[in-house]
């Protein structure tokens, strides 16, 4: 079993969530009582990963600080006997988990962001998890499905893995996947035959699959990233590098289990907030009642 590191690219400026993200990193926007990035780290840790690399930007100090120890806050909570809150704060970065930071100086695309992590990851296989797509842990056990299953399959086969989901409507804003065989059941796997970032004419592709921001990548991806020219929006795209890799070796797509929310966009963020809010143990029942009252006004 390989000791894989996970890379989370958090250097993006969160354009879809402006003006909220003008001064607050998108990844720190709360979903009930935890910032978005915390759900991502929790998912990675549940998959058995102990080393996480955040690719940050000068404006993302809040993300770095979130995972640092706050001795003053912990001391205050201890003095006030807020044991539950203290435990929650201390578990933000679980024991045995290391979170490192590297900087992306220029916004040259997701592929470039991943390359910025290479000095820390080394010429080794690794994981990429995008910070704004949250997989609902109530609909899929993170200890068994999705990223955890992708890691297990990579350890078994050595083949790169990409998580996919079905998407209705316009796919021109997404990374579209076409597979050799149909993915007709959650967790099913098939080889990728085409992978296109934000296709101009998605209707010409015989596919309704899009990438869900989870990748387990073989070490061969590094060479492809180095060779990748700027693509969609003039950026170096991870999708383009994976597409080239898929021409040379098998790259698998795995159909996602459960539900996901694109919290980098307003609708997905609002859906996730409501879903997690309704499940909140302390306030969920009152929140549900409040929503029902609003809907009947």
Swiss-Prot record:
EC number: 2.7.7.9
Keywords for this protein: Lipopolysaccharide biosynthesis, Nucleotidyltransferase, Transferase
One biological process term in Gene Ontology: UDP-alpha-D-glucose metabolic process
Signal peptide segment: none
Pathway involvement of the protein, from the record: Carbohydrate metabolism; nucleotide-sugar metabolism; Bacterial outer membrane biogenesis; lipopolysaccharide biosynthesis
Reaction catalysed by this enzyme: alpha-D-glucose 1-phosphate + UTP + H(+) = UDP-alpha-D-glucose + diphosphate
Alphabetized GO MF terms: enzyme regulator activity; UTP:glucose-1-phosphate uridylyltransferase activity
Function statement: May play a role in stationary phase survival.
Family to which the UniProt record says this protein belongs: Belongs to the UDPGP type 2 family.
Name used for this protein in its record: UTP--glucose-1-phosphate uridylyltransferase
Organism for this UniProt entry: Salmonella typhimurium (strain LT2 / SGSC1412 / ATCC 700720)
């Amino acid at each position: 079993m390989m000791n894989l590191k996970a890379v989370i690219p958090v250097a993006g400026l969160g354009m879809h969530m402006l003006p909220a993200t003008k001064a607050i990193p998108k990844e720190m926007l709360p979903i009930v009582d935890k910032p978005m990035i915390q759900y991502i780290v929790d998912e990675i840790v549940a998959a058995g990963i102990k080393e996480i690399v955040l690719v940050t930007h000068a404006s993302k100090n809040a993300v770095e600080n979130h995972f640092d120890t706050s001795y003053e806050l912990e001391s205050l909570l201890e003095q006030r006997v807020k044991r539950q809150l203290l435990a929650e704060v201390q578990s933000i970065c679980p024991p045995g988990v290391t979170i490192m930071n590297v900087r992306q100086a220029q916004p040259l695309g997701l592929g470039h962001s991943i390359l910025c992590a290479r000095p820390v990851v080394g010429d080794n296989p690794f994981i990429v998890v995008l910070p704004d797509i949250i997989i609902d842990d109530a609909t899929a056990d993170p200890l068994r499905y999705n990223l955890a299953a992708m890691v297990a399959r990579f350890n078994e086969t050595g083949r790169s893995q990409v998580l996919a989901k079905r998407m209705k409507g316009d796919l021109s804003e997404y990374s579209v996947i076409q597979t050799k065989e149909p993915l007709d059941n959650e967790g099913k796997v098939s080889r990728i035959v085409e992978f296109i970032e934000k296709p101009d004419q998605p209707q010409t592709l015989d596919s309704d699959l899009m990438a869900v921001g989870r990748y387990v990548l073989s070490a061969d991806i590094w060479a492809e990233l180095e060779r990748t020219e700027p693509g969609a929006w003039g950026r170096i795209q991870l999708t383009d590098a994976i597409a080239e890799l898929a021409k040379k070796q098998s790259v698998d797509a795995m159909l996602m289990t459960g539900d996901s929310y694109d919290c980098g966009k307003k609708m997905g963020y609002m859906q996730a907030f409501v879903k997690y809010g309704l499940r909140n143990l302390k306030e969920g029942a009152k929140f549900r009642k409040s929503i029902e009252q609003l809907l009947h006004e």
